[in-house]
């Protein structure tokens, strides 16, 4: 199943900030990084403010990484408004 999601410039930035540490962590642990790598390239290639189609697996991966980023920022006492907005789009 796929869903169309509109990504703003801020959404793209937050997604890439969340996916990059996940990618490097998985790579350091020796796990398969094909799916996160492909998703990073897909998001980076998208024009801002356009709808894009994402698979269920891609959406799950985005939710996990954005939630990790949000929790990390909450722990540091930083704002999480952009991450919260994106999480709402992904549910």
Task: Please give the residue ranges for each predicted region.
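Positively charged, low-complexity terminal tracts
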Residues: 1-91
């Amino acid at each position: 199943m796929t869903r169309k999601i509109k990504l703003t410039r801020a959404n793209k930035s937050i997604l890439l900030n969340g996916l990059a540490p996940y990618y490097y962590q998985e790579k350091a642990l020796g796990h398969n990084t094909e799916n996160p790598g492909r998703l990073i390239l897909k998001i980076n290639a998208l024009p801002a403010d356009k709808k894009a189609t994402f698979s269920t697996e891609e959406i799950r991966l985005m939710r996990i990484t954005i939630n990790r980023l949000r929790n990390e920022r909450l722990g540091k006492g930083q704002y999480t408004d952009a991450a919260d907005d994106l999480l709402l789009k992904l549910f």
